[in-house]
Amino acid sequence: MSASSLLEQRPKGQANKVQNGAVTQKDTLNDDEFEPYLNAQPRQSNAYTAMSDSYMPSYYSPSIGFTYSLNEAAWSTGGDPPMPYLASYGQLSNGEHHFLPDAMFGQSGALGNNPFLGQHGFNFFPSGIDFPAWGNSSSQGQSTQSSGYSSSYAYAPSTLGGAMIDGQSPFAANEPLNKAVGMNSLDQGMAGLKIGAGDMAPKVVGSGLPGGPLSQVSTAPTMPPASMAPAKTASWADIASKPAKPQPKLKTKGGLGGTNLPPPPIKHNMDIGTWDNKGNMPKPAAPQQTSLPTNGQPPNQSSPQPGATAGGVPQLPLSNGQLVPPTGQLVQHPLPPGGQPGAVPPQLSQGPPASQPSQPTRWVPPRNRANGFGDAAGGPGQSPPNSGMGGITVPAEPHPVLEKLRMVNNYNPKDFDWNPKHGRVFIIKSYSEDDIHRSIKYNIWCSTEHGNKRLDAAYRSLANKGPLYLLFSVNGSGHFCGVAEMRSPVDYNTCAGVWSQDKWKGRFDVRWIFVKDVPNSQLRHIRLENNENKPVTNSRDTQEVPLDKARQVLKIIASYKHTTSIFDDFSHYEKRQEEEESVKKVEVQGSDPYSNNSSRSHYRMQDRQGRVK
């Protein structure tokens, strides 16, 4: 083995005795001559300097080796003041820079008194080794005390053989070289939040280092980073996921307990858009705390068509069969001094709004009859008491006109013959329920000019051989309101003068048999072959129904157990008729009935509400 090959295998940093020249034959040595140097002095420093220089021994690294292995050294806890940042540059035995106190000025030349070996710089004395103490204090307290200076002047532990200068805690023995300066302090702090101080003890420098020469110790810490990196990454992921875990628990407790803030919005959102919500009911009900005056008033305030009450809040029938005026008819009336708007919401909240979802698209009767326009209609037993209705004028007894009509006529008979052998049946479409009320009251009817001719011809054709039944329905109401029998031919020269519109001419007598509200859903399955096979509910005025289909319709109407009828609103329509008559008296005195804008809008509103939507 040549000397040049031996020089290449020497540890890094050892000086070559033959510099700047070729190796001659006389300089060649045997292998066994280097054994004492390679085996006996592995720990000595290789930086030899001339002893004649009084400054060099103390200024640079000491020329003597350490007398103990570095794996016995305690990791500095930073108990000493962070002095190394005031030191000047020097070099350790492995060739890396470090900071040491300047021994040139104000320091003794003896190496025994040099801070390099006095525990101030390295704390190399094995006495007081306490690894668990490092885990408790370094990760939580000491890293914050010395990180102000030590993190800026510390170097990788691989360059110091696993030792730390002046208790600088930011670097561990397994610190990767590519990690930013000071990141170890952050890792230790975050890891301490997760696994505590007891699990940090295995990361102490001395635990994973072999007890060998300095050159071997310096390479040992380079292996653990590969295995320790996943553990740190896992701790970061666990810590990041911790804040998200309590969130579902808080929501669950809030929904079950009902005492936190989330339940009120949930309860509020459940009420919004549902028909059981009574929060919006008092708004239209407040102005109805008054009775209708009987003196003359503008028609636009008092007598709109029944369709004008679609937006109003219907009321349930009272126990005595009478109903209070609907809200849609009394919105413009002033509130009397004795009215109590606050008493209305409890009464309105008791009504079951069964069919309200479909009301905005069709005509709605003015009272609580709207609750019965469905297959699952509520019974009259659901009507609220009238004790809390405030200033509403409620008749104590049924209307006298209605009582007289019921005594004279046997409405809704149980022994009705719905299967006549001969007869004819026609559909009657009314523009308003006001006209239905007056037809029941006066037992008369009048259709259009074309309708009168058709009905008159049909009546005469029967020649009393069979009945002629009329199935009444208000345009857009969604139900049939009754059945009447035509009892006389049409008198074209007579004008009744009782209809809500004065454009009707002619009159014929009728007798009302059934007065009940039957929903279209009960009759929609019956189709008419003489009307393009359309349902009987989709018919025009004076549309004739074939006798076989008419028997089905009459049977359903006769057997249907109704819950509402126009009788529930009879008092209401009586008041409307009185108001219209008072308006007509003013017109007779010489004023143009259409000169007043309010009167004109009133009649237009009636026409609009009477049309089929």
Curated annotation (Swiss-Prot):
Biased composition (Polar residues): 16-27
UniProt entry keywords in alphabetical sequence: Cytoplasm, Nucleus, RNA-binding
Location within or outside the cell: Cytoplasm, Cytosol; Cytoplasm, P-body; Cytoplasm, Stress granule; Nucleus
GO biological process annotation, one example: endothelial to hematopoietic transition
Biased composition, class Low complexity, residue ranges: 218-234, 295-307, 345-360
GO cellular component, one term: cytosol
Name of a matching Pfam family: YTH
Region annotation Interaction with m6A-containing mRNAs: where it falls in the sequence: 398-613
Residue ranges crossing the lipid bilayer per the database entry: none
Binding site for RNA: K429, S430, Y431, D435, W445, C446, N475, W499, W504
Biased composition (Basic and acidic residues): 578-587, 604-613
CDD domains from the UniProt entry: YTH
PROSITE patterns: YTH
Function: Specifically recognizes and binds N6-methyladenosine (m6A)-containing RNAs, and regulates their stability. M6A is a modification present at internal sites of mRNAs and some non-coding RNAs and plays a role in mRNA stability and processing. Acts as a regulator of mRNA stability by promoting degradation of m6A-containing mRNAs. The YTHDF paralogs (ythdf1, ythdf2 and ythdf3) share m6A-containing mRNAs targets and act redundantly to mediate mRNA degradation and cellular differentiation.
Entry's free-text remark on domains: The disordered regions have the ability to interact with each other and to 'phase separate' into liquid droplets within the cytosol following binding to mRNAs containing multiple m6A-modified residues. This leads to the partition of m6A-containing mRNAs into membraneless compartments, where mRNAs may be stored, degraded or used to transport mRNAs to dendritic arbors in neurons.
Protein name: YTH domain-containing family protein 2
Lineage: Eukaryota, Metazoa, Chordata, Craniata, Vertebrata
